[in-house]
């Protein structure tokens, strides 16, 4: 029985030999599938997003940005620090979103009959789960985190989100959300605002594309960024 509890197996479902369930029977039984603790949250999120798409008057502002210089800087930075302090390009977008939300506080907060500006930036990050759903845990006080700290928080949230082990407090609405696509994916992302927030930043894939520099056509690493805002 102790072995069955450890493996998450219902003893009553096992075949007994002479009315005795053996350890071999327990060990050969398939393990119970891990519980996805975010399942209820994902269902609630789906309902909330459907309502948001119907009720929030979205408008979109789109800009394509040359990332070549930023990526060159990031490669040099990562080469100069220890492996544990290296960061992914995605963290540059998170940091940029934090800076932008600080400079434009009208996009950083919640709407409930009227707008409530947030005292800091609690950055929501859209994360795909292993079961195919989407959750948006938040990084509290992101305005106080440097790139290395942001990277640490992001890695931890993504790991636990995929394992279904996020805390309820981490799944509370942030003050603004960033949703990004993996490199090699679609060019742009037009997101749906996560209520009660009033804005969402969608990051497309970074790829080499034609660009004009000083009147000359060149190849640069660019990304299309889309701001979804509540009109």
Which role fits each region the language model picked out?
Residues 3, 7-10, 25-230:
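C-terminal catalytic/motor cores of large multi-domain enzyme assemblies
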Residues 11-17:
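Major-groove DNA-recognition helix of helix-turn-helix-type DNA-binding domains
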Residues 19-21:
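Acidic Ca2+-chelating loop motifs
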């Amino acid at each position: 029985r102790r072995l069955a509890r450890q493996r998450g197996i219902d003893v009553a479902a096992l075949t007994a030999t002479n009315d005795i369930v053996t350890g071999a029977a327990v060990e050969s039984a398939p393990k119970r599938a891990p519980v996805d603790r975010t399942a209820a949250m994902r269902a609630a999120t789906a309902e909330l997003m459907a309502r948001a798409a119907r009720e929030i008057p979205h408008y979109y502002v789109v800009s394509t940005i040359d990332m070549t210089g930023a990526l060159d800087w990031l490669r040099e930075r990562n080469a100069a620090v220890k492996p544990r302090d290296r960061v992914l390009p995605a963290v540059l977008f998170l940091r940029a979103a934090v800076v932008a939300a600080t400079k434009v506080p009208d996009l950083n907060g919640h709407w409930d009959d009227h707008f409530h500006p947030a005292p800091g930036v609690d950055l929501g990050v859209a994360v795909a789960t292993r079961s195919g759903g989407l959750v948006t845990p938040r990084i509290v006080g992101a305005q106080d985190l440097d790139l290395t700290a942001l990277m640490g928080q992001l890695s931890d949230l993504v790991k636990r989100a995929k394992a279904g082990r996020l805390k309820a407090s981490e799944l509370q609405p942030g003050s603004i959300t960033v949703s990004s696509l993996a490199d090699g994916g679609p060019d742009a992302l037009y997101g749906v605002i996560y209520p009660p927030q009033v804005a969402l930043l969608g990051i497309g894939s970074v790829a080499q594309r034609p660009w004009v520099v000083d009147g000359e056509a060149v190849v640069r690493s660019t990304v299309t960024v889309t701001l979804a805002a509540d009109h």
